[in-house]
């Protein structure tokens, strides 16, 4: 049977462009190895014209950040009638807004950290909540703009009010959750497993930890009790379903193992466009579940649809 023509969308114009190019080229190489006819599309503002001319059978969305994972390009693909991978317009927009995604997760009974959304200029010189807390852009990924305010710091970081800040006006101020960094991948209605992320030389899972070779160590499967492991799997699937995700998603958690039972589990966010670089988590978790990179991507292509 003739393999499909797949347009791999990558690059774009968000702050996550380099990550997207890495993801996109990794995916394109693997899909070509699987026998698909692949067109690599470095996305610009005329992407609708480019896709109209290419006429692909499927658009594989390897974009990250605004435009690529906030429902915008998904809307373009729906308008053009091109089947595409990952989540649809509504789920993508919802998951991209960390505050709205937390609201939905909480309503579904998923434990989340207390937080509030503010304009960054409101923060000024006074702590918006008792340290320790985390300040993060409401709609960015790859840990761009994440600032941890520790106990003992006399005032919030000055960068929040400076011209150097390039991550939008709305920020989420969230209670800092100590403990272990865990993540869980979901593929359709199947949970693939839980992985622990151990940053190497960094205090938390920041941009360098995520994408620099050797920046972090992935312990897959996570070395936690079976009860906690299974609970995190159930919560990740519940978040995937509550937000309306399709294809592959990845939920991030903190787990404070000093607390009794399941009390230390806190859901942080869901990623509807998880990275697919050589150092990314979802390919590692899938491999532990017996699914190779090429097989994972082939499943995503065959799962593509329009509408989503």
UniProtKB/Swiss-Prot annotation:
Q: Which residues bind Mg(2+) 2?
A: 269, 271
GO annotations of cellular component type: cytoplasm
State the organism named in the record: Chelativorans sp. (strain BNC1)
* Stated role: Cell wall formation.
- What positions does the domain ATP-grasp occupy? 102-302
Where Mg(2+) 1 binds, per the record, is at: 252, 269
Query: Cellular location of this protein?
Result: Cytoplasm
The note describing how and how many cofactors are bound reads:
Binds 2 magnesium or manganese ions per subunit.
Family assignment? Belongs to the D-alanine--D-alanine ligase family.
Superkingdom field:
Bacteria
Q: What is its main location?
A: cytoplasm
Which protein are we looking at?
D-alanine--D-alanine ligase
Q: Name one GO biological process term.
A: cell wall organization
Binding residues annotated for ATP, in chain numbering: 128-183
Q: Which pathway features in its UniProt record?
A: Cell wall biogenesis; peptidoglycan biosynthesis
Alphabetically sorted, this entry's keywords are:
ATP-binding, Cell shape, Cell wall biogenesis/degradation, Cytoplasm, Ligase, Magnesium, Manganese, Metal-binding, Nucleotide-binding, Peptidoglycan synthesis
Mark the transmembrane ranges.
none
Cofactor(s), by name: Mg(2+); Mn(2+)
Q: Name one GO molecular function term.
A: ATP binding
The record's section on NCBIfam families has: D_ala_D_alaTIGR, PRK01372.1
- What is the reaction catalyzed? 2 D-alanine + ATP = D-alanyl-D-alanine + ADP + phosphate + H(+)
Q: Name one Pfam family in it.
A: Dala_Dala_lig_N
Q: What is its EC number?
A: 6.3.2.4
């Amino acid at each position: 049977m003739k393999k499909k023509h797949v347009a791999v969308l990558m690059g774009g114009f968000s702050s996550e462009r380099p990550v997207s190019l890495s993801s996109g080229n990794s995916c394109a190489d693997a899909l070509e190895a699987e026998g698909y006819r692949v067109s690599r599309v470095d996305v610009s503002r005329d992407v609708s014209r480019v896709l109209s001319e290419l006429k692909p059978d499927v658009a594989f969305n390897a974009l990250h950040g605004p435009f690529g994972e906030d429902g915008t390009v998904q809307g373009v693909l729906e308008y053009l009638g091109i089947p595409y991978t990952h989540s649809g317009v509504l789920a993508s927009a919802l998951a991209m807004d960390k505050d709205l995604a937390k609201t939905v997760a909480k309503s579904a009974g998923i434990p989340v950290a207390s937080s509030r959304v503010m304009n960054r200029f409101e923060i000024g010189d006074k702590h918006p909540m008792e340290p320790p807390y985390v300040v993060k852009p409401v709609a960015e990924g790859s840990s761009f703009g994440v600032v941890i305010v520790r106990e003992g710091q006399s005032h919030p970081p000055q960068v929040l009010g400076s011209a150097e800040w390039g991550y939008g006006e709305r920020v989420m101020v969230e209670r800092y959750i100590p403990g272990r960094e865990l993540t869980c991948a979901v593929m359709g209605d199947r949970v693939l497993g839980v992985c622990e992320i151990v940053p190497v030389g960094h205090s938390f899972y920041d941009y360098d930890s995520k994408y620099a070779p050797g920046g972090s160590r992935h312990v897959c499967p996570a070395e936690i009790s079976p009860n906690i492991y299974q609970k995190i799997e159930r919560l990740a699937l519940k978040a995937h379903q509550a937000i309306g995700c399709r294809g592959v998603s990845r939920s991030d958690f903190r787990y404070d193992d000093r607390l009794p039972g399941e009390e230390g589990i806190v859901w942080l966010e869901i990623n509807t466009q998880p990275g697919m670089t050589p150092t990314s988590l979802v390919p590692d978790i899938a491999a532990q579940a017996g699914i190779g990179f090429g097989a994972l991507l082939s499943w995503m292509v065959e799962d593509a649809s329009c509408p989503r």
